[in-house]
Amino acid sequence: PVYVPTTRVPSMLPSLPYLPSSGSSQQASPVSSHSIWTQPGAESAAYNPGSSHPPVSPRFSFSTSTPIPSTSSRDAAAAYSSSLSLSANGREQYSRGFGSSYSSPYPAYVSPEMATTWTSSPFDSPMLHNLQSRGTPAAARHANIEFFDDYSEGRECVNCGAMSTPLWRRDGTGHYLCNACGLYHKMNGINRPLFKPQRRLSASRRVGLSCANCHTTTTTLWRRNAEGEPVCNACGLYMKLHGVPRPLAMRKEGIQTRKRKPKNLNKTKTPAGPSSSESLTPTTSSTSSSSSATTTEEMRPIKTEPGLSSHYGHPSPISQAFSVSAMSGHGSSIHPAISALKLSPQAYQSAISQSPQASSKQDSWNSLVLAENHGDIITA
């Protein structure tokens, strides 16, 4: 569809063939759609006098700028049909009468100069002519491939003499190298050796070997010294660690292996807990010196849980509740109780919870003092 702005209409009025030449100031309404799809009824109704333009196509609607002045419908129809019969740009096969359902789109509404620019073939462009004037690209491409094939036939690796390779490379002087030699030279900085590296000696080839230092023939691992001579594992490790040859006096007939622990040692070994004689039984010595030494050793603060401090009623350590004289007098009986408390505070807490609680906060300590006076031993 072609939309003509109202500002350009006055300059196009002389070139429109279907308008009368009486000089009446008319303005063409904007065309809504391509007139080739319009029906004859819609075209005849579009030029009724005294009415505004209805939409040319029922699919689109545009408002007109000014209504057409009252002219005879026959004159307008005759002028329009005569314009359709013009053979503009040699298109007689597309021009039909007014009563036909198809009409030529551009000469009726647009000037011939504009119509020729818009109705030109999409292939009539200078770009197409330039593409056609150029040679066929396929032929040039095949020619280049053949040229490179001919040029690459004479290549040869200057190191190993290979004639074919997935990728040709060059060394520092510009000579061609195959992919393997080029990569080796790039990574190591030297030319790739032409012979394959020697494989490790098999078991049959190691039969006649002997250590160059101790002259043994049995070893778990053969090594080489600085001169490249084969040495046994012991001599090689000794030389590596100490920097001097291994003395011949250290030679042994058998191979000394590392004493490794068996894998099932942890499964067969039973866990050894704290001995009951060390933690729960009192000391057998009855001398005062041993009793006083044990008492001073056990005067260290007992580590308890934070929740037990509120049960005791005072933040001071348990060792401060007893005097040195009281503990020294009953060292044989108080020692196992304190050691039991130090080793297992949870067990002592359970023992305290089982004892009857009185209104006083220090009833648990009173029961401990009573048990101590009677010579009883509190066990977990």
UniProtKB/Swiss-Prot annotation:
Disulfide bonds: none annotated. It holds the Pfam family GATA-N. A zinc finger (GATA-type) spans 157-181, 211-235. It is found in: Nucleus. The gene is GATA4. InterPro entries: GATA_N, TF_GATA_4/5/6, Transcription_factor_GATA, Znf_GATA, Znf_NHR/GATA. Residues 14-35, 58-73, 275-296 have a biased composition (Low complexity). Gene3D superfamilies: Erythroid Transcription Factor GATA-1, subunit A. Residues 14-73, 254-316 are annotated as: Disordered. Keywords: Activator, DNA-binding, Metal-binding, Nucleus, Repeat, Transcription, Transcription regulation, Zinc, Zinc-finger. One of its GO terms (molecular function) is DNA binding. SMART domains: ZnF_GATA. Transmembrane segments: none annotated. Residues 257-266 have a biased composition (Basic residues). More abundant in heart, with lower levels detected in ovary and small intestine. One of its GO terms (biological process) is negative regulation of transcription by RNA polymerase II. Its main location: nucleus. This is Transcription factor GATA-4. GO terms for cellular component: nucleus. Transcriptional activator. Binds to the consensus sequence 5'-AGATAG-3'.
